[in-house]
Amino acid sequence: MYPVRNLETWEALGTMSAHYSVKSILHTTATSCLAVVCLVGACSAGIISAQVDVYDLHMRGLMGALASNASDIQVTGQEAHHNSTVVAWVNVDGTQINYPVAQPTSTMADDYYLHHAIDGTPHSLGCPYIDRRSSKDGQHVVVYAHHLASSPLLFGELANRYQQDAFDKLGNATWRSVEDGKVDRTTIFQPLCALRVPASYEAIQRFSFTSIEDMKAWLTELAREASACTENWQTAISGARRVLSLITCTEGNGHSMRRTIVIFVSGDQSEAG
């Protein structure tokens, strides 16, 4: 297990303005915890709406490019962008989640994509990103994104999935791994369980395993602790080879101390391209 000590929360308190700026208060430790991914809900509805509209247009351009050529996502609208930061694309059935995913490089702060769009543009809504200790093709992929109060944008639709009735409405997650600007491999993950946990929750912070059986034992412990599970969770675990965890703040109020974790599993029946 990745060593965790002096556990604290990363706090990113987003205060938006009409100029789309954000003031972030960040408490960091030497060891990463579960990133704070919630935005202040006290902003005016008009400012939040403007933020969402601008972000939505930006993301629609990227999604349109992917739809027009599933193997090349570097062309956005009428402009060409070198989206070398796009390492994957995530889609969750039953939600509006359909986003490119980034991962901080060794020269970036761990929380860089909490306040930067996928192309590196400063933006208070950030973009979904992979935990630095994880990898896009790893056994356990951990992805963070903001929960914006009163909006389904980013991972807002996941915040209440620790409740069984909400969890039951979730569909599969499609994970498209990207290499050199092209979709390299597609993996389908099925929902396994969801938890509401403290920000310093240690159990989810495992990124490698000694064996498949070790991974299954870990998943079993998580499923038993979860407040929402798929009906056939034991069967799902028995066939699991990879895990995808999507994480956001439970409350979109800017100072949430709890995280919602939605865990998906796959037998890793990936398709190239």
Model-inferred region functions:
Residues 41-273:
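Solvent-exposed, non-transmembrane regions of membrane-associated and secreted proteins
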Residues 13-19, 36, 71, 224, ...:
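Intrinsic disorder/low-complexity segments
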Residues 27-46:
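Hydrophobic membrane-insertion alpha-helices, especially the h-region
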Residues 1-25:
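N-terminal Lys/Arg-rich, disordered targeting/topogenic segments
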Residues 20, 24-27, 34, 263:
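Intrinsically disordered, low-complexity serine/threonine-rich segments
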